């Protein structure tokens, strides 16, 4: 299936669902509140966004029309899940790098490997590069072009990759915004350490809340509304 050009908000919604499916499975599929919260995270997102409920709902409806997102009906709160792998005809490693590129912008193979450790574990950066080349080859073989390798930025050791689901990228702007090698490596190390710590804490918190809610349902105990609402906001 050929995916039509996505808007930045549609790409953010889709990428967020793909991320949360792997990183907080106990809270997945996501409610609208949790999805909006994930879209607007201040970490692991580039660029930062302020997506509101109406914008997220419009993006969901558009993605549903392409079978990229499904809406569940088994819960009192509508919940949403992605169908990217099947709709796009990609495997799990390919979906992982596409999701990361949608959420965090242009990245090198090494950055994708580090940033995606909680999604999928690659043996090394060469394995990530091989997946990116597979996606690039799909476009060269007559399929839909989904990724592009950017020219090497001044002072950079590696070339970055960008996704094409939102159309042709502005190469000049991307090259102008590329960090230097020292800046990129230092920032990546600090951010990765903080994100890994935060992600572990949030995953533990989401799992605990899920267990409490399950036990309360089994015992027929009504929990305070604040805890129930927190369950919908937990995956960040």
From Swiss-Prot:
It comes from the Bacteria. InterPro entries: DUF480, WH-like_DNA-bd_sf, WH_DNA-bd_sf. Belongs to the UPF0502 family. HAMAP family: UPF0502 (MF_01584). This is UPF0502 protein Bpro_3844.
